[in-house]
Amino acid sequence: MEYLNLQRLDEISEQSFQTCQPYPWANIEQSLTPEGYELLRQTMPAVEGFDKHVGVKRAYGQAPHDRYLLHYRPGVEVAQPWQEFIAELQGPVYQNFLRRVLGNHTFIPTFEWYYAWEGCAVSPHCDAARKLATHIFYFNTEDDWSSAWGGQILILDSERKFKVHSGPTFDQLKVAASIEPRGNGSLLFQRTHHSWHGVRPLQCPQGKLRKLFLITVNIPSFQVWWRKVRGKDPDGYRLKAAPTGSRTEGVRYPCSASCLPICAYIPGSVGCHVPSPST
């Protein structure tokens, strides 16, 4: 079974991607094979296995990004189609696609599922410097998600008025594009110092979930290196999932003194994903 629609990926040229404004992005329709998309959609992970993030403080005055989140690591149990898809994403074909449109870098991909409920939003932000790009796959359809409920991914134009480490509101930014995250499609965008993006609060009925699968295209950085030394992946998670029910699973702990200068978290609020040696 092939999951990536290689013909569609081949149609994305480096020039068209890199010259897109206000920063490099592409909405890729039919980015998965029809059979692969349907198989993945039918075997999405159950929300009961996710961590629920509510009110997690962000830097620079940005509003929290509430959501259910499942971070993939060896040991995380997902359906066979998802194991096959992730293996394909780690293989040479997808890696070559990324190098063609993003440049000849060393990529360290990480994978997450995001589910969001009524009222959840993604406040405007630029991603961390270790994230060269993000590739978001949509897993709602017209049958289970109405466009009237929102959820559109907004490509925002700051007109270079705001520093990357700031917290502008939606009203202070222009909407360059509004991406409907439904059906077999995906959004690839490159991180820059002005790659602002966000999602306004969802207005869906209770019980409905907006479902996405994200690939974070990390590149080697001091932060990534330091986390690897400490047995973590680029996102700060242990390289292997903790056994179900263990103390570390789904819990964040305050940073230790040694990692406060390194971690990208706010001291005393979010902290690391795993206990420091002192806890």
Q: Where does each model-flagged region fall?
A:
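Catalytic core of non-heme Fe(II) oxygenases with the double-stranded beta-helix
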Residues: 78-79, 87, 95-228
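Non-heme Fe(II)/2-oxoglutarate
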Residues: 4-5, 14-97
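A short, polar/proline- and glycine-enriched secondary-structure boundary/capping micro-motif
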Residues: 50-51, 134, 236
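N-terminal low-complexity segments that are often proline-rich with Ser/Thr-Pro
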Residues: 248-279
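Fe(II)/2-oxoglutarate
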Residues: 1-21, 165, 229-255, 259
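Short hydrophobic-aromatic micro-motifs
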Residues: 26-28, 186-189, 271
